[in-house]
Structure formats: structure tokens, C-alpha cells
Amino acid sequence: RLILPEVYLEDEDAARRVENIHAAMDEYSSDVLTRAVDGFVYVERTEQSGRVRQGLVGKIDLEAYSYEKGARPAIRPSERTVTERIPPRMAVRRGAALETPHVMMLADDPGCTLVEPIGAHKSELKKLYEGELMQGGGHIAGWAVEDPAMLAQIDAALAALGSQEAFDAKYPQAKGAKPLTLAV
């Protein structure tokens, strides 16, 4: 209800869909989103098989991102950006009560230094939500990560993952290239 799926970007009723998204945002702003998290949300999704997938939900500085071909910021896409899809997405953002652009960020973290240490301390975190996902998607739960020490730990892990030394060690064939901290 809060996003315009790509399949509908060029539909004739896209404007109506955007209006519905804005109405849903207004509803969520007053009825659902009752607490802002000043930090990250640690998320665990338990699949039907029992496998637990961990992640962090947070915000990124768009000044550290570029989709331009040849650009080498710390955060960049793993594939070409389809620029024709940007205007319909901007239509959703114009007049929106919430900022809800979303992307999956990927970190090459073989040492498990970013997410897993937070998960090891989830008992110390305040649980924000928990529930079953639809269509056999499993179970999901989220915890607020607001402790200054944990936030510093996340920042340090990201800095280490984005260091030239770590990048050169992981990717000797690209030694000296601008490090990629997060891929979109």
C-alpha cells in the first residue's frame, strides 16, 4: 500500500494508484507508525524451512550514492539503473506524507562483522514488531537498535568494510579501485 510496484509504473491508472498510496501514507502516519527509531532496526525473518535470515533496516546518505555510469561512490548499484522509471517514482514522492523509497543493500561481509554482532545482542533490544508473513513467507520480527555503542559498532563495521585495505584484500584483481561499501 505504500509503494508503486514496477509492474504498474506505466499503467493508465498510475495517478490513481499514487493517490491511494498517499492516502495509505496518511493513515499509516497517524495509526501505524507510532514510534520513530533513532538508529536501525535489526530484522530476523524465519523461513518455513527454519532458516533465519538477518538484516538491518536503516537510512543511507544519498550523497554517498550515484547510479551514473562510471561513478565510484561508496554506495552504488550492482546493475544499470533504468532512468525511465525515475519520474513515476518521483510522482509518488511529490506530496507524500512519508519517505518510503526502498532498496536492498548488500554488503560483502565474509567475517560477519555488520549484522551478526547485533543479532547476538537482540535480547538487549526493544522488540518493535513480530508476525507471520503472507503466502508462506515465514515469520518476521524487528528490534530497535538505538544504543550508542551498537550504532558505533555498525559505523565501524561499515567503515572497515569500505576501507581500501579490506577492498584490496577481498578483490585483488581490482586492487586500488575505489572501494564499494554497499551495493544496491
Language-model-detected regions and their locations in the chain:
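A short, charged helix-loop
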Residues: K126-D155
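N-terminal extension/subdomain marker
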Residues: R1-G136, A174
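A sequence-level detector for short glycine-anchored, His/Arg-bearing signature motifs
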Residues: R93, Q135, A149-A152, A156-A159, ...
